[in-house]
């Protein structure tokens, strides 16, 4: 079976980590080897860039274009040093976020032109597209409430409600436009979300469990 690149997307507080635990459980049950990773981050250099973007300790503004380029510098490291080699070896890759998050957060939220983001993807990631994107949709107010229970808000989580409304809109537009994406209502119970994820994976891997 050809290796798969699966991405979990959604606003902060949507439950991506929980969803990934369900994907892990499913793949392990079906004896499918996989690595689990995240963005921003995924490699040592990418994690350093993540820390700079989310927890800027310097008395200097990070401009929207700079934020995008730092995230993409980390993404190139992540893709070339971890994602692509694993897929070439026949190992499935499951990632908490990928380039959709840049389209939504930097494009929708910050207002960076989406064409710039697509160009970065085409030029530096060979136009890489996940085999499957599971988008967890949640109202930004509920998502931020959930995120605040986990810990102190990071730099992006402090961006405000309108920022997240714009971000959500781009996520939902992407789901409508792409055949490899499925939306789940993340406000539903954990049990219902788990059930839906298993059904999606059954169909994707052509399994009948």
Curated annotation (Swiss-Prot):
Top EC class, one word: transferase
Domain of life: Bacteria
UniProt-annotated binding residues for ATP: 10-17
Assigned keywords, A-Z: ATP-binding, Kinase, Nucleotide biosynthesis, Nucleotide-binding, Transferase
Keyword Ubl conjugation: no
Gene3D superfamilies (UniProt xref): P-loop containing nucleotide triphosphate hydrolases
Keyword set includes NADP: no
Protein EC: 2.7.4.9
GO terms (BP aspect): dTDP biosynthetic process; dTTP biosynthetic process; dUDP biosynthetic process
GO MF annotation: an example: dTMP kinase activity
One GO location term (cellular component): cytosol
Reactions catalysed: dTMP + ATP = dTDP + ADP
One Pfam family recorded for the sequence: Thymidylate_kin
HAMAP family tied to this protein: Thymidylate_kinase (MF_00165)
Role this protein plays: Phosphorylation of dTMP to form dTDP in both de novo and salvage pathways of dTTP synthesis.
UniProt similarity note: Belongs to the thymidylate kinase family.
Protein name: Thymidylate kinase
Organism encoding this protein: Francisella tularensis subsp. holarctica (strain LVS)
Gene this protein is translated from: tmk
């Amino acid at each position: 079976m050809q290796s798969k690149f699966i991405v979990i997307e959604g606003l902060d507080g949507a439950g991506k980590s929980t969803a990934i635990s369900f994907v892990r459980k499913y793949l392990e049950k079906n004896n499918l080897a996989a690595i689990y990773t995240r963005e921003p981050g995924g490699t040592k250099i990418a994690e350093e860039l993540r820390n700079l973007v989310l927890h800027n300790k310097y008395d200097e503004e990070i401009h929207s274009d700079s934020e995008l380029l730092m995230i993409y510098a980390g993404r190139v490291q992540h893709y070339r040093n971890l994602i692509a080699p694993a897929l070439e070896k026949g190992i499935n890759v499951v990632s908490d976020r990928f380039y959709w998050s840049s389209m939504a957060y930097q494009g929708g939220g910050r207002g960076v032109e989406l064409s710039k983001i697509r160009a970065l993807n085409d030029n530096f990631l060979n136009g890489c597209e996940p085999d499957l994107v599971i988008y967890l949709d949640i109202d930004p107010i509920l998502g931020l409430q959930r995120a605040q229970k986990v810990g102190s808000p990071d730099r992006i989580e402090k961006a405000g409600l309108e920022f997240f409304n714009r971000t959500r809109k781009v996520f939902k537009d992407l789901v409508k436009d792409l055949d490899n994406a499925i939306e789940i209502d993340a406000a539903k119970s954990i049990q219902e979300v788990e059930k839906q994820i298993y059904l999606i994976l059954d169909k994707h891997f052509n399994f009948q469990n």
